[in-house]
Amino acid sequence: MKHIRRRNFTNGMIGAAASFGASSLLAQPAKKLTLYMGPPEPTSAALVAGFEKRSAAKLTMLRLSAGEAVNRIRAERNNPQASVLYGIGLPSMMTLKADGLLQPFKPAAAAEIPAKYKDPEGFWTGIDVDFIGFASNKTFLKEKGIKAPQSWEDLTRPEFAGQICLGSPATSGTGYTFITTVLQVMGEAKGWEYLKRLNPNVAQYTRSGIGPTQLVGRGEVGVGILFAHDILGSIHKGFPMEMSLPQEGTGFDLFCAVMLKGAPEPEMAKDFLEWAVTPESQELLAASEYFDVPTHPKAKVHDLVKPFQNAKLVNFDFNWAGNPATRQAIVTRFQN
C-alpha cells in the first residue's frame, strides 16, 4: 500500500480549499440592476457609469420617454422587468403611484433635500427641476426679421406657420407638461381653443420631448417647445439657438427617482436611489450636458442655468396633472 506523506496531504487539502473558495466566489451572481431612464442617452450613460464605478454592479438601462415608461410599466405589472425609474417627470410618477406601481422608499441621503421635492410617503424623490421654454433657431429669426417668441400667444403668429415642433403629449412628458401648463394658465376652455389655433403652426409632434432639439438645431423648423435643459444643452454644443420664456409664466416639472413595485433587484435599487439623491450624482447631470436645477442644496448649479434660476413659474397643480383620469382625458382629446 502506498502511503501519502502528511505534508503532501495537507498541502493538497489547502490547494483544494483555495480552489473551491475561488470557484465559490466566481459562482456568486454579480450584482445587477435594471433601470428605465428618462434623460438623454449620454446623461443616462454617465449616470450608469458613475454608479457602476462606485458599486461594482452591472447595470442594464433602457432610455424611455415619459409616456413610453408609463405604458411599459403598466404592461409589465404582473412581471416587472425593471427595479428603478429615473428622471421622469412628477405627473407621470403620480400616475404610476395612483396605479399602485411604485414601491415607497425614503433614501437616508434625501434628508437634506427640501420637503417640497419629496413625497411624504416616500414614493418619489425629486432629483432636478426644469421648466418649459422656447428654442428658436437664430438663422430662422434673422431671415424672417423677427424676434424669438416671448409669450404663449406669440406662437400662434402667422410668421411661425409650420415652424413649430414639440413632443406629443401621448408619449412625451414635455408635451404633456406643455399642454397642462397652457390649460392651467388660460383655463381649460380658453386653453383648448388656444391649442386649436396653435395646431396649424405645428410642423411635427415628436415621439420624444427631446426630439425637437435636432430639428431646431439643423434649421428644419424655426421654434421648438422644450424643457430648458434640452435647449441649454444644445446651445452648449454650439447649435445656433436662443432660449426665451413666456412672460405669462411657464410650467415646470420635478424629475424624480423611484423604486418600482415588485422590483426584481430591491436591494440594488435602494443602493442606487441612495446615491441618486447625493450632490455627487446630481452634479453628473450638468457634467454630462443636462442643465437643470438640482434639488440637493449642496449640489453645484451650472453657469448656463444660473441666469434662469428665477424664471417666472406658474403655480403648477401636480395633483391634477398627475391624476390618471386627467392624463387620459387630455391625451384622448388631443388625439381626437
Where are these regions (language model features)?
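N-terminal secretory signal peptides and thylakoid transit peptides that target proteins
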Residues: 1-17
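Early extracytoplasmic/lumenal segment of secretory-pathway proteins
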Residues: 28-94
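Extracytoplasmic ligand-binding site segments that recognize negatively charged/polar headgroups
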Residues: 38, 42-45, 81-220
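A ligand-binding cleft/hinge motif common to bilobed small-molecule-binding domains
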Residues: 91-95, 217, 222-240, 289
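A bilobed periplasmic-binding-protein/Venus flytrap-type ligand-binding module shared by bacterial periplasmic
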Residues: 135-140, 179-180, 253-265, 284-285
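Periplasmic-binding protein-like
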Residues: 194-199, 205-206, 237-263, 297
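Mature extracytoplasmic/periplasmic domains
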Residues: 260-318
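Conserved C-terminal helix/tail region of periplasmic/extracytoplasmic solute-binding proteins
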Residues: 316-336
